[in-house]
């Protein structure tokens, strides 16, 4: 059964658009920090007949018949997730990281309770109490940021805020923080004020799984994550904790609390991705992700472009473009013109609006999946610097695009293994 050939026959418009997106991915340098390239096996699992199956409830406790095989699949996904993160309990049903966070909030909080998370403009996430998100509308959200001098977490300041506001839940884990998170210090603050502690490790899950970043499981009451980004699986969510009885609360908050039927085709793809991440070569991949980020950061610094916090400990490199008198909006456009995909991003204490910003966020997970190494990332950094430092030079723009295409040809995506219908 050739699903892609069937698609080409039944809906050539969608087939052609998928083909266009595949070609875009092949010919661009993907540096969006929240993106990665799933394996063929992951994509095949999520494109399988499992999409036909409804399975409300948990394995062995379904509200529908015919679930014997999806039960086995989901149980395998749960066990692999637990093994991967040294957890005692896992729920693999959340459709996204945001859904996972919502389920945790439903379990632990009542409307009006105080939550303490990082300010979005300092590297937090919408679901950590932003006023435009449900988390900021239903709860009394207060925020901490980074130190103005170091752009790193200052636990003395965070402790003072927690003591003054007495949050019921403290959230750590970020979308644009390039440094190691000290979960033990957060645990100490949470204990002092009597708060629950939640870690959202969506960006660093793959590094945690590879034991290249501290594991939050021993310190946090609950851990949420996405399953893509550095974990390199399908788009989806995951909840983990060390207390099985506590975990039962989250089970009920996922279903029936915030979701109906689980997406068993995505859960199968999660199981495949977790299995891949349990292999020794995934640790090597994660090591290269961090190494590449450090190389990219140092290359840009050497060209006179400031990096928030002076470097990185993970996959994120956050450029502070005030050092070259440029906005994130302009930089995003400039690199896109030479086939580099990134995103404008606020930096701590940013004078610009979120629609303009002073930063550009880069990530190394996707290109590392393509096989990019230290040498390749030096070239990536040089191309970015050449483009940003010479925004009006059309010759340099042309040369930068040619260099990008040369890199793409040197590190092909999927190595032409996709079906011919989308080649």
From Swiss-Prot:
Marked site (Plays an important role in substrate specificity) residue numbers: 228
Modified residue annotations for N6-(pyridoxal phosphate)lysine: 229
Subcellular location: Cytoplasm
Segments forming a coiled coil: none
Chain residues that bind (6S)-5,6,7,8-tetrahydrofolate: 120, 124-126, 353-355
CDD domains (UniProt xref): SHMT
Organism in which the protein naturally occurs: Prochlorococcus marinus (strain MIT 9515)
Subunit composition and interactions: Homodimer.
UniProt entry keywords in alphabetical sequence: Amino-acid biosynthesis, Cytoplasm, One-carbon metabolism, Pyridoxal phosphate, Transferase
Superkingdom: Bacteria
Cofactor(s) needed: pyridoxal 5'-phosphate
GO cellular component, one term: cytosol
Protein name: Serine hydroxymethyltransferase
